[in-house]
Amino acid sequence: AAAALARDEPEPVAPPAVPAGLGRKHRGKESTQQAFGRFFVDLVHDAPEVAERVVTVSPDVASSTNLGGWINKSAIFSVGERRDWFADDPQTLVHWHETGRGRHIELGIAETNLVGLLGELGATWSRYGQPLLPIGTIYDPFVGRALEPWSFGIYAGGQSILVGTPSGVSLAPEGGAHQSIVTPSIGIGLPGCTAWEPAFGQDLEWTLLHALSRLGQPGGESAYFRLSTRPVEQVLAGEDASDERRRSVLAGGYPIRRAEGRPRVALAGMGAVMPEVIEAADVLGDGVDVLCITSADLLFRALRARAGFGEHQADILDELLPADRAAPLVTVLDGDPHALAFLAAVNATPLTPLGVTRFGQSGDLAEVYEHHEIDAETIVGAALDASDAQSG
């Protein structure tokens, strides 16, 4: 029986070298979901050998997760050639050309089938010696629905990227049904996977390229991205596109602003709420450190490593939250507040964790943020209370 199951080991093909950056200047207002869509256009142009290995998969949300440009260039996979009856319609933005060489697979409403397919596509490097770079997109609340089969695929050696977008209550203008709260915590707790929640387009570009570079190889790793449709002014991140900034982004976070001398309070934000965090810092004035978290997952690993658990590097903690700048900490995200609460343990500082603990509300974004107490005014109040308590 064993002989019948035996097979020759395939000659492995190394995955293509993934560039560190794509050279796009991220300016004006841009959401991370928009940056995600533009990423594929840039990848085809600047790194075609990488793009040739990319396979995207979506249930019924290819267009609404900004894969339209990629689909127009890569086509839909189909066993046989199919005619696109709307190809001559000038109002059709996405051309559903179906061919055996297509690199996007459309599944309909079937999230569990999607992640099962991601696992299989992500295992071709070990089974057939041919690495693929699979990326799946789903609305973020359905990450929970897809979690068990995707985690099983990761456990079995399938390396893939899952993008949950849009996410949080930031999509409140669309309604209350698709809001996600617990997914940041899911990302932190999933073995074999790194969770990312970038706030800015440049950070998304760097982290997604890095995630692609970790696929299709021994010792590789899957990735989960939590993105948003909320447009954010890119200038808020500063103009720093240096290698040092990139290393910090890939390590889990970086300072956007440092107070002169020791700060009175530190504000740490992640994802779509960074404009509110920075606005609050502007109101508070001098004496505030502002930190942009790109991966709570990596920072939590670093905290454990500093205590002697795991093999992760802990250097980012000294860069992001140095002991000589320890101050009361206010954390903010569009998700459950406990996902960033561990940061207070870095320097044993007082903590005020702000985030979303209820869902189902639809309305204007400013009103919804105020309702969930992740607006700038609430952040200012929390920072003042924390600072006063420390000085008192």
Tell where the protein language model's regions lie, with residue ranges:
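Thiamine diphosphate
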Residues: 1-392, ...
